[in-house]
Each structure stands twice: as structure tokens, then as C-alpha cells.
């Protein structure tokens, strides 16, 4: 089973234990072993941190799904991209639509979608949460747990 994530750029540190316990439940009780996470904002960073920790204890795989090809500056790129992937076909998408394309791709792959959405106004996270619900994905909202 596959899980992906959408959340606001700014998130309180207090949700990290809830995120961790939610992921452990998905791994232990719902056979989730593959995770796709973006690389934009605080929620994504928190998810990556927790997944890295859990990957040391559980047989799981996670990938950071990029919206753009990484750019090299000065000819040398010291960044390790071994845990990243690009969605198939994204190279043909105009840059201004790349994040939306990436997010839709992540939803299509997922069985579960974990979100942290506390407001809808101008929120891409809220938009993609609604899309996941419309595609009948199992959506777990962390904002109101605990």
C-alpha cells in the first residue's frame, strides 16, 4: 500500500507525535510500506524527518517526489538525490504547473493520504486534500487528532 502527504508550509511542532503514531499505525495495521512526500514547506520537512527515523525500524521505502529537475550551480551538485523521483511525464509540463502535476500524480499512486489542513483560503494543501477525497482515497486529517 502507498501513502502520500499534503499540508501547510507552516506547521506546529506539536503535531509530530501525532504524525509519527499515524504512520506507525499505517505500517503496522494497514500494510503501508511505500511513501511519497513532496519537498515544499514545513509539513513535508516534518514528514521526511519522521519517515527517515521510521525507516531505521521498519521495512519501508520513501521517496521525495520532485516537481522540477534539480539544477546544478557551478557544475557541481553535492546534494544526494538517491531518495528522490520525478513523476513520469513531468518534463513536458510548464514549470508553473509542475507542483500541481506532481501532486495529482502522488494522489493517483496513493491508497492513503495524510494531511494537515487547518484552513482552505488560498491553500494548495486543502485543494489537493479535496481532490484526494473526490478520488475516494482514504484521507487522514492530522489537524483535529489528539
Short names for language-model regions:
Residues 2, 9-146:
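Acidic/glycine-enriched connector segments
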Amino acid at each position: 500500500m502507498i501513502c502520500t502527504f499534503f499540508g501547510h508550509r507552516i506547521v506546529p511542532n506539536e503535531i509530530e507525535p501525532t504524525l509519527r503514531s499515524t504512520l506507525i499505525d499505517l505500517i503496522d495495521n494497514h500494510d503501508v510500506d511505500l511513501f511519497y512526500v513532496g519537498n515544499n514547506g514545513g509539513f513535508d520537512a516534518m514528514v521526511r524527518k519522521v519517515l527517515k527515523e521510521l525507516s531505521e525500524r521498519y521495512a519501508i521505502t520513501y521517496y521525495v517526489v520532485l516537481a522540477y529537475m534539480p539544477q546544478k550551480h557551478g557544475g557541481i551538485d553535492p546534494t544526494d538525490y538517491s531518495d528522490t523521483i520525478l513523476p513520469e511525464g513531468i518534463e513536458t509540463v510548464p514549470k508553473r504547473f509542475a507542483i500541481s502535476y506532481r501532486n495529482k500524480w502522488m494522489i493517483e499512486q496513493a491508497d492513503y493520504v495524510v494531511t494537515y489542513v487547518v484552513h482552505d483560503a488560498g491553500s494548495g494543501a486543502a485543494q489537493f486534500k479535496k481532490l484526494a477525497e473526490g478520488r475516494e482515497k482514504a484521507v487522514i486529517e492530522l489537524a483535529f487528532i489528539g
